[in-house]
């Protein structure tokens, strides 16, 4: 769908599905989480080498549902970079976005935790968070693209995020909980055209 509208799209399936999905789709695949640990005796941890072996493009880091201390975020991003994988770092507010931008991720998604999974998009409920994060990230890491997450459900939310300076959006529940996920994706994509 994204190709038809010339909109880049990536997907972040559950960890057990990474290799299967990565081998079957033509779009970038992201892990939902990675731990900054070496491969070896690390029960329950997800080392960057493991996701790389799955054929993924990169990983989310520090999602509000799986936060890491700032030092671990930095280590995770460094490990991903060393393996030539993309880091999509998540931040809950402008101050955290500014601090984590120093890790120089390819993308930084700003998602206030209280709006994740809700019906109100951060781009409309708290637009200053999006515009503030865009300004802060550009100041610290001009090459990092800012994504807008939390409550993004439709083309209006996407357009507002782009107007505020975001390069794209990060969504989950708008698609995974939709009665018709394909229609939900199409609705979101039309916000880019």
Language-model regions, residue ranges each:
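Conserved N-terminal beta1-alpha1 strand-loop-helix module at the mouth
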Residues: 1-46, 87, 95-105, 177, ...
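Hydrophobic faces of well-ordered beta-strands that scaffold small-molecule active sites
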Residues: 9-13, 29-32, 59-61, 87-89, ...
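Glycine/small-residue-rich loop that forms an oxyanion/phosphate-binding "nest" at active or ligand-binding sites
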Residues: 26-82
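Glycine-rich beta-to-alpha transition loops that act as phosphate-gripper elements at the mouths
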Residues: 33-36, 40-43, 69-71, 90-95, ...
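Glycine/Thr-rich beta-alpha phosphate-binding loop at enzyme active sites
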Residues: 35-38, 43-44, 109-134, 144, ...
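Glycine-rich phosphate-binding active-site loops on the catalytic face of alpha/beta enzymes
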Residues: 57-68, 107-120, 162-185
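C-terminal helical cap(s) of enzyme catalytic domains, especially alpha/beta-barrels
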Residues: 76-82, 122-128, 162, 173-193
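Catalytic cores of alpha/beta
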Residues: 91-104, 141, 148-169
């Amino acid at each position: 769908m994204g190709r038809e509208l010339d909109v880049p799209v990536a997907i972040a399936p559950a960890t057990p599905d990474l290799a299967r999905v990565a081998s079957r789709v033509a779009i970038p695949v992201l892990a939902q989480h990675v731990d900054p640990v070496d491969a070896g005796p690390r029960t329950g941890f997800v080392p960057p080498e493991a996701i790389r072996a799955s054929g993924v493009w990169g990983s989310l880091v520090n999602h509000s549902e799986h936060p890491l201390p700032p030092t671990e975020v930095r280590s995770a991003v460094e490990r991903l970079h060393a393996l030539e994988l993309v880091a999509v770092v998540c931040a809950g507010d402008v101050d955290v976005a500014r601090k984590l931008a120093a890790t120089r991720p390819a993308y930084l998604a700003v998602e206030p935790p209280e709006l994740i999974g809700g019906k109100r998009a951060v781009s409309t409920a708290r637009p200053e968070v999006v515009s503030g994060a865009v300004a802060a990230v550009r100041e610290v890491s001009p090459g990092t693209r800012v994504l807008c997450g939390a409550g993004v459900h439709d083309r209006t939310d996407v357009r507002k995020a782009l107007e505020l300076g975001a390069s794209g959006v990060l969504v989950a529940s708008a698609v995974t909980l939709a009665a018709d996920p394909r229609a939900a994706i199409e609705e979101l994509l039309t916000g880019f055209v």
